[in-house]
Amino acid sequence: MDLKARIRRRQRGGVDARLVLDYDAISPVAHVEEPVGRGPVLELLLDYLDPVFTGDLPPDAYVWGPAGTGKSAVVTALFDGLRSQLARSGSVIHTSTRAASATEEVPEFVYVDGREARSDFALYHAVLDRLLDERVPEKGVGTDTLRKKLREALRPLSEKLVVAVDHVGEPDGPTLADVRERFEPVDDSVAWIVVGRTPPGDLKVDLPPERIEVPAYRDHALVDILTSRASDGLAQRALGHEQSREIATWAEGNAHDALAALFGAADHATAENHQRIQNDDLTNGIMDVPRPSASLGRVLALPPNRQRVLRALVELPERDRQSVDSATDAIVNSPRIDLSAGTVKRFVYELAEAGIVERVREDSTNGHGRPPSRVEPCFATRVFRRLHDLQQGER
């Protein structure tokens, strides 16, 4: 934590001191500028990217590792750092709308979240939006137009581009083969990095020449992450060292789940008017995170109408979730919802197919037909509730 952050903490301390000072600082979907415990991985990525410092492109690459290993945090921090450092040194890309100003050209770096750029159109739009100074239209143009615009942006001065496409291989998202196909028309000017979870040996596609593994965190690294985040986002001494160790041991190398448990514990403590996180707060925070857990980043990247359905779902008592029909009826009656019962039911089935919720088959049928399916969220509901409400301007 830097000096300014320390001073702000002192300013906020006092009679009305809050337990949670900054929800973003402890959020499992927020990334920090300097990822904790990932120095060796950053060095591997810098070794891979070494050709860019002489103006060349590296080979295409696959960065992989299990959930919660900090892949997104590392790649976003690295790309932000490269853009910042290279811009200060005067090495910038030239485009059709940006004046040439550098004698030594290096590739531009673009990060794309596959959760938000699932189609060809969305991917090209995300890249062009970062690459060009001019506004890229979202409507009234087709995918072919954007593909042509990307070729034109890269062609005039033999410009080069390194694109990282994150969260590849998730349900409804792009695959590695999709990324390769989408950049094939400009493969002489683009090096792509695909970031995903699937081990290379389990992929049934031709793999890029470079593969970089991001292993699960060790317990001591998770403790450091939790301590750092708590230092930035919570009141002083709100989280004890033994509590950090308990979360880290439970999370088994998964920083997403560890931070979700911390967030849930802090939120529970706030609701109970505790000045520090108590053992019952910690227990509630841990119990709120299913194992395995759907990433909250996936949930919060869903379209707003589906998020509203989930927000209504997490408020339902268990008796209203005993079947898809009963859950649908209860959701439709929520003041948050202005959708028809048919639309809500379709959303519930789609969310179940995507692994966001689960339809749990009941054992008893009473001898009549198929047993009903209880609807259970597959994500940390307390954390989602708070993050969703904060996004909507609610407290």
Regions found by a protein language model. Give the residues of each.
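Alpha-helical sensor/transducer elements of the RecA-like P-loop NTPase core
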Residues: 209-228
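Walker A/P-loop nucleotide-binding motif
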Residues: 57-77
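The feature captures the helix immediately C-terminal to the Walker
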Residues: 76, 80, 259-263
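Short acidic, hydrophobic short linear motifs in intrinsically disordered regions
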Residues: 319-331
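Conserved alpha/beta core segments of nucleic-acid transaction machinery
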Residues: 272-314
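Terminal-proximal interaction/regulatory segments of ATP-powered molecular machines
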Residues: 329-395
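Mid-core helix/loop region of P-loop NTP-binding domains shared across ATPases and GTPases
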Residues: 94-106, 116-178, 182-195, 199-206, ...
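A short, basic N-terminal segment
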Residues: 1-57, 81-84
